[in-house]
A protein has these predicted regions:
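ABC transporter nucleotide-binding domains
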Residues: 1-239
């Protein structure tokens, strides 16, 4: 039986608590993800799926519930060092490849952020080699490292975001609508790249999207969200 890499138990994410405009963005949901699988989380805009992803990686402070990663409850991590270690294992690819890359940084420095924070390169030469290798891995040329994000297309920028996520050699990646901002012609290329990387690096994915057909294509199991609730869960060919 594969290992449960992630377990979400009774997760609640409320905003404006105690006020008239209190929002129950995620309302008592539970699911687990096995090591090596892709779990798709699908739902219309405002269903709570992206909030779930952001709460798992602790960009939001959960209102209630447990988030177990490899058996450790990450909601109990309070220190910066502990969070840095957690984000070494868990990375996120964001929906908007335009907004998620710093426009004032060169691509090589964007990709190397995690390498620098975690001290993964012992010299400038090793850092440069790691970045070049990552650019090649996502189908870009090492020479692209000297350019800025605005010089790239949406699909290329998303590849840069994927390279940044891979830089720290994570075990688990949250893909938050990684293709919805891209042209349809580019979407399949990015999905195929994610699948290739999963095989090569033994990655586990939480794949968040509103397009059920694309989620079914990439996922082993799927959860369907609506109004903060997880309404349905099962194998991708049964949803």
């Amino acid at each position: 039986m594969p290992n449960k890499l992630l377990e979400v138990k009774g997760l609640k994410q409320y905003f404006n608590v105690g006020k008239k405009n209190e929002v129950h963005a995620v309302n008592d949901i539970s699911f687990h993800i096995y090591e090596g699988e892709t779990f798709g989380l699908v739902g219309e805009s405002g269903s709570g799926k992206s909030t779930t992803g952001r709460t798992i990686i602790r960009l939001n402070e959960p209102t209630d519930g447990e988030i177990l990663f490899d058996g450790q409850d990450v909601t109990k991590i309070k220190d910066k060092k502990g969070l840095t270690k957690f984000r070494h294992d868990v990375q996120m690819i964001f929906q908007d490849p335009y907004a998620s890359l710093n426009p004032r940084m060169k691509v090589r420095d964007i990709i190397a952020e995690g390498i620098d924070v975690n001290g993964l390169a012992k010299s400038p030469e090793e850092r440069a080699k790691k970045v070049d290798d990552l650019l090649r891995t996502v189908g870009l040329n090492p020479s692209h490292g000297t350019r800025y994000p605005h010089e790239f297309s949406g699909g290329q920028r998303q590849r840069i975001g994927i390279a940044r996520a891979l830089a720290v050699k994570p075990r688990f990646i949250i893909c938050d609508e990684p293709i919805s901002a891209l042209d349809v012609s580019i979407q399949a290329q990015v999905v195929n790249l994610l699948q290739d990387l999963q095989r090569e690096h033994q990655l586990t994915y939480l794949f968040i999207a509103h397009d059920l057909s694309m989620v079914k294509h990439i996922s082993d199991r799927i959860g369907v969200m609506h109004n903060g609730l997880l309404l349905e869960m099962g194998k991708s060919d049964e949803i």
